[in-house]
């Protein structure tokens, strides 16, 4: 074919878009971006409820800027590149700014995987400044870019007369009355030489601590919490009732003078900041400075990025300004921002990504946490692939599903979390729906005379997420107690995820108090599968401990080419194991822990809801481990400070065959908890009408329970067999589990000492101490506070933290304070340590 023929077809030209096609595409894209960015700006500035992170807005804004630069004729009148912020809310008087409140151009310094910043945009800013100053060498001031609300304060003759929000940069809202409630804004300027007029620009914000306190109050009052401190500050400042604003504890930092008449005239911005302080304003001291060149500025920026999580307020970058006000004037402005300043943003702490899967993690305490597995996204200086979903309630509230596009936040060292779902990007599928055919028939009606038109509707591709019913590690049931947000694996020490924490608690000072065995050694023993259960600690020996240490030190020992501690090198060069003191100390500590107080042993078991105080109550009520193991749930629920939830937890623990086997192993290993004096006899607290009223599945008041007890002849056997008792009771006792519970109660009470036997000291009770309330104050000569408390409680006494008329004795040591004074005022007996020991016998 002749290449010069006019009929020759150039397929490349056919596929290449024409200029008109490109222009049409650009026009459509500009229109879409303008609408989208205006909607996002409305959400951010007007509703105070942004739906996308700042980084997403910035990316789209730059895309629109680039398109408008290439096609200036296509720029729309409402393009966000031509204005600042959003329109003011209704409800406040409008204020027109004599000097427009402009925003700043953004600059970014992205980090690579090693945390190294790319400061190319800041070096370009520095070069533009130098070019604008004909090669001059500018100084820069760098200060925090607060994440709050821009405010303009107008003072006449030193008195605050007006406060206005930025609004759209030209017109804002009059919030004078609300601003007057901000405690660190001077209502009258300080100093003698105050200007006749000065307009101060700055940022209103909420400190992190005040934000936490506010959200706590919101939750307590059943109100919706704020998403972040900026939203809280904006919402507080826009309250029509200034009394509400006053309760919110807002804060203000100034950053520029918009206009001024008379008074001190600064030549540099750093002088302006000092002038603000002289007038009575607060400054972010220690977090701003003046530097001679851009490299010093960037070093301070990196320092502040590291310091950011420790600051008392939220910042999302640093503002860099030319220090000389004359140079600022020379550089001037572009359409929407000054040429002499830039907002140097920190790496994004929020980003968009997709949820690829949701599974659960089991924590060291058994807490079950749903975790979103994410498409990798770079946020907060690191690549994030996982984010916490906290608990089932949070998953349901946010409605996070597999496939969703979500906003992920990572701030400092905080664990990444899913903030919200972008619902318009949720993957959907089409499904057929039954519809009317227009004459009364449905599409699924077999008798329809005419078929209906097919119709479909969009539904989410994935179902709502629900926690699994069993632990993925040990297959134990996952349980969630009523009123608690966190679900937990019920496996305890049976679950490998909980094993290390359980052993650390078991060996801790307030539990078994195993001297020499710390967290590090326990974690190494568990990691190497040398210890699985509590009893395994009592089977440890020197070779096992040496193996643990040698394995843990292997990498270090190899790199240093030195023998690890506890070994020696013979003539052959081979390592020979030798007994070492550290291992002997651990074994000695384990041996010494074999006869713990009963309360310590019970606390060491790690029973859910059983802290030190509850463990002591159990010991004082039952006296021996065997009685505690067999205590029925209704009896437990009658004891002081033990309600239904705690009683159920204790009974559930001892009802598990695995937990009973674990205790039997400890006893077989030589652990022998001491017998405790019974000072809270169940017969006194678990009176028949009380435990009957707490029987599971049988609702009855204590008064009616008392009547039932009397009808049964005041004995459990009557409750079991008397056929004259009410039919609802007979129906309840006929259930096998309930019949077994009654038999257990009968056996249990038969083996417990009576109240009289307990009072006579059959369990070794000290009559002079039993039932008495003691308060400890000051430093005792020889006893530590917890030692004195243990001695008193072992003798049947009770230790309280405060002095009252019900206090029997105050034990006072050196530097006793107000408790001793109150004891003397109330006439309470005061004992020295020696007198206490005498009383204890």
From Swiss-Prot:
Residues the record lists as binding Zn(2+): 471, 474, 489, 495
Keywords: DNA damage, DNA repair, DNA replication, Ligase, Magnesium, Manganese, Metal-binding, NAD, Zinc
GO biological process: DNA repair; DNA replication
Biased composition (Polar residues): 561-570
Single GO MF descriptor: metal ion binding
Catalytic reaction(s) noted: NAD(+) + (deoxyribonucleotide)n-3'-hydroxyl + 5'-phospho-(deoxyribonucleotide)m = (deoxyribonucleotide)n+m + AMP + beta-nicotinamide D-nucleotide
Cofactor needs: Mg(2+); Mn(2+)
Family: Belongs to the NAD-dependent DNA ligase family. LigA subfamily.
GO cellular component, one term: cytosol
EC number: 6.5.1.2
The keyword Ubl conjugation appears for this protein: no
Protein name (record): DNA ligase
Binding positions for NAD(+) per the UniProt entry: 54-58, 103-104, 143, 166, 203, 321, 345
Segments of this protein annotated with the region Disordered: 554-575
Keyword Hydrolase in annotation: no
EC class of the enzyme, as a word: ligase
Ranges for domain BRCT: 764-841
Its biological purpose: DNA ligase that catalyzes the formation of phosphodiester linkages between 5'-phosphoryl and 3'-hydroxyl groups in double-stranded DNA using NAD as a coenzyme and as the energy source for the reaction. It is essential for DNA replication and repair of damaged DNA.
Active site: 145
Gene3D superfamilies: 5' to 3' exonuclease, C-terminal subdomain, 6.20.10.30, BRCT domain, DNA ligase/mRNA capping enzyme, Helix hairpin bin, Nucleic acid-binding proteins
């Amino acid at each position: 074919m002749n290449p010069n023929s006019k009929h020759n077809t150039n397929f490349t030209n056919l596929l290449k878009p024409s200029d008109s096609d490109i222009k049409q595409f650009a026009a459509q894209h500009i229109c879409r971006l303008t609408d989208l960015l205006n909607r996002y700006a409305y959400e951010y500035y007007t509703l105070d409820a942004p739906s996308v992170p700042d980084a997403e807005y910035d990316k789209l804004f730059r895309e629109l800027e680039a398109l408008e630069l290439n096609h200036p004729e296509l720029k729309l009148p409402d393009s966000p590149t031509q204005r600042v912020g959003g329109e003011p809310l209704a409800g406040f008087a409008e204020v027109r700014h004599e000097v427009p409140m402009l925003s700043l151009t953004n600059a970014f310094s992205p980090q690579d995987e090693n945390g190294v910043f790319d400061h190319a945009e800041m070096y370009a800013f520095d070069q533009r400044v130098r070019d604008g100053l004909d090669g001059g060498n500018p100084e820069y001031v760098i200060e925090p870019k607060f994440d709050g609300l821009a405010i303009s304060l107008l003072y006449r003759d030193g008195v605050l007369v007006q406060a206005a929000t930025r609004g759209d940069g030209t017109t804002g809202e009059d919030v004078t009355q609300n601003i007057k409630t901000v405690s660190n804004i001077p209502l009258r300027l300080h100093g003698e030489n105050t200007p006749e007029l000065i307009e101060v620009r700055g940022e209103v914000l909420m400190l992190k601590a005040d934000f936490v306190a506010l959200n706590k109050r919101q939750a307590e009052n059943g109100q919706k919490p704020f998403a972040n401190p900026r939203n809280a500050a904006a919402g507080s400042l826009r309250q029509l009732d200034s009394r509400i604003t006053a309760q919110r504890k807002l804060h203000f930092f100034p950053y520029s003078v918009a206009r001024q008449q008379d008074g001190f005239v600064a030549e540099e911005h750093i002088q302006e900041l000092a002038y603000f302080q002289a007038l009575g304003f607060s400054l972010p001291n220690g977090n701003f400075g003046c530097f001679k060149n851009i490299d010093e500025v960037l070093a301070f920026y990196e320092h502040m990025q590291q310091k950011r999580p420790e600051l008392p307020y939220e910042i999302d970058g640093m503002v860099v300004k030319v220090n000389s006000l004359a140079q600022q004037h020379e550089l001037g402005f572009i359409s929407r921002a000054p040429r002499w300043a830039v907002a140097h943003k920190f790496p994004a702490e929020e980003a968009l990504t997709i949820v690829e899967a949701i599974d659960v993690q089991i924590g060291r305490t058994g807490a079950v946490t749903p975790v979103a597995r994410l498409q990798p996204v770079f946020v907060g200086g690191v690549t994030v692939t996982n984010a916490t979903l906290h608990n089932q309630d949070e998953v349901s509230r946010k409605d996070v599903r597999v496939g969703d596009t979500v906003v992920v936040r990572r701030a400092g060292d905080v664990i990444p979390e899913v903030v919200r779902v972008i619902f318009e990007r949720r993957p959907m599928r089409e499904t057929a729906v039954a519809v009317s055919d227009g004459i009364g028939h449905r599409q699924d009606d077999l008798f329809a005379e005419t078929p209906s038109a097919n119709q479909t509707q969009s539904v989410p591709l994935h179902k709502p997420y629900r926690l699994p019913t069993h632990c993925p590690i040990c297959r134990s049931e996952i349980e969630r107690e009523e009123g608690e947000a966190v679900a937990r694996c019920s496996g305890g020490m049976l679950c490998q995820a909980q094993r290390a924490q359980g052993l650390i608690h078991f060996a801790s000072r307030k539990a078994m108090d195993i001297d020499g065995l710390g967290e590090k050694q326990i974690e190494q023993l568990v990691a190497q599968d040398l210890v699985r259960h509590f009893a395994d600690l009592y089977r440890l020996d020197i070779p096992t401990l040496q193996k643990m240490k040698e394995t843990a030190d292997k990498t270090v020992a190899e790199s240093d080419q030195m023998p690890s501690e506890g070994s020696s090198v013979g003539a052959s060069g081979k390592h020979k194991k030798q007994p070492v003191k550290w291992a002997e100390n651990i074994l000695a500590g384990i041996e010494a822990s074999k006869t713990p107080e009963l309360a310590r042993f019970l606390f060491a078991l790690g029973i859910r809801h059983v802290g030190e105080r509850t463990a002591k109550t159990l010991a004082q009520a039952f006296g021996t481990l065997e009685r505690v193991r067999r205590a029925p749930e209704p009896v437990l629920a009658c004891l002081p400070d033990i309600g239904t939830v705690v009683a159920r937890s204790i009974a559930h623990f001892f009802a598990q065959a695995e937990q009973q086997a674990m205790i039997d192993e400890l006893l077989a290993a030589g652990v022998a908890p001491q017998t405790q004096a019974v000072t809270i006899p169940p017969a006194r607290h678990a009176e028949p009408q009380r435990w009957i009223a707490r029987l599971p599945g049988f609702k009855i008041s204590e008064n009616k329970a008392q009547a039932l007890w009397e009808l049964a002849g005041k004995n459990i056997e009557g409750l079991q067999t008397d056929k004259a008792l009410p039919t609802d009771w007979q129906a309840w006792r006929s259930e096998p589990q309930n019949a077994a519970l009654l038999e257990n109660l009968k056996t249990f009470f038969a083996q417990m000492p009576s109240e009289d036997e307990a009072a006579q000291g059959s369990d070794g009770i000290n009559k002079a101490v039993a039932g008495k309330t003691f308060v400890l104050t000051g430093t005792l000569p020889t006893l530590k506070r917890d030692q004195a408390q243990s001695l008193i409680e072992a003798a049947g006494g009770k230790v309280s933290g405060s002095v009252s008329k019900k206090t029997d004795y105050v034990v006072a040591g050196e530097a006793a304070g107000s408790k001793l004074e109150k004891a003397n005022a109330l006439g309470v007996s005061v004992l020295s340590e020696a007198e206490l020991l005498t009383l204890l016998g």
